[in-house]
Swiss-Prot record:
Pfam family, one: SpoU_sub_bind
Keywords: Methyltransferase, Transferase
The protein's enzyme class: transferase
EC number: 2.1.1.-
GO biological process, one term: RNA processing
Protein name: Uncharacterized tRNA/rRNA methyltransferase HI_0424
Entry keyword annotation includes Methyltransferase: yes
Disulfide cysteine pairs (residue numbers): none
UniProt GO cellular component terms: cytosol
GO molecular function: RNA binding; RNA methyltransferase activity
Biased composition (Basic and acidic residues): 16-38, 44-61
Amino acid sequence: MNDKRKPSFQSAGKTFQERSVGEKYREKPTQNRPHFNDKFNGNRNEKSRFPRDKQEVKETRITQLSLSRAPSNKNAEQPKVQVTIKSTGTVYKTKEKKTGALSPRAPEKIKKNRAEEMKVYGENACLALFAERPESIVRLWATVQMSHKIGEVLSYLAENKKAYHVVDSEELARVSGTEHHGGICLLVKKPRAFTLQGYLDIPRNEDCLVLLDNVNNAQNIGGVLRTCAYFGVKNIVADNVENLYSAASMRVAEGGAEYIRVLEADYIDSALMQLRKSGYQIIHVSHNKQGDPLDKVRLKNKVVFVLSESSTESLATPEDTQARLTLASPIKSGLNIAVNAGVLLAKWYFR
């Protein structure tokens, strides 16, 4: 190999010193960011170049002109030519407020949906709801185990383009708000309540109603709903419709709520007056010895059983019936109202 082609290595003759970067080197140059200057210099209150209340619109403009041509003869008239010029320009117009159908995610629509929708959980409650009013279902959540049992429900939702989610038990507990979800939760439209006066306007020869006074416990309400459905009583009078349509009450009812219609009343005392005028026999549960034993009570064709978590003596009138469920009992508080409902409705059923 030729020695001239051999590489030669030379040591560096210069040394470099490490320099520290100060604060001024960390600052971003302003000359390269002109569009940020106004924003960070305290000029936010100045009028924006592009107004937010207006939108940019492409507009076609048509202009007509009349052009004259020089005549060949001075004495002749000047000929004219009509010219149409078409151009496209940009204009800013005020945004028009949308008046059509609201988007499903619009705040007004969300607020309305929350007022009209509720959640139902529990296997029996959800399956009974699907059997009676499947069109009211908006969305479904279910665990993997439950999804194997509700294939018909999932097929219906898929055919009608309604959403359903297969989630784990923890996620379902967060969605439903309880650990007692039973593996399934539905978002549904609330059932519509009817007015008591509208119900009484239709004459009936035979009827049985249950009136709830001061009943707020979801376990008690659910038990009464299930008992009424079991004995074929289809109407309940109440002044707290929201309590009857709560998710906890419907879970305890285990599907019985789907067979019950709520008759809404403004006040319980006025509702009892309306029922008396319509010819209904009002029956209260009595814990006093002055009450009539249940086996001695004669039921009329139109009956209203008044149930309460407390005493209903203040609502009773002399024409009402006070029924005793036992002749002697060491328990002064009596039975649960769901049990009272079962005893009274059984007598009505086998009258």
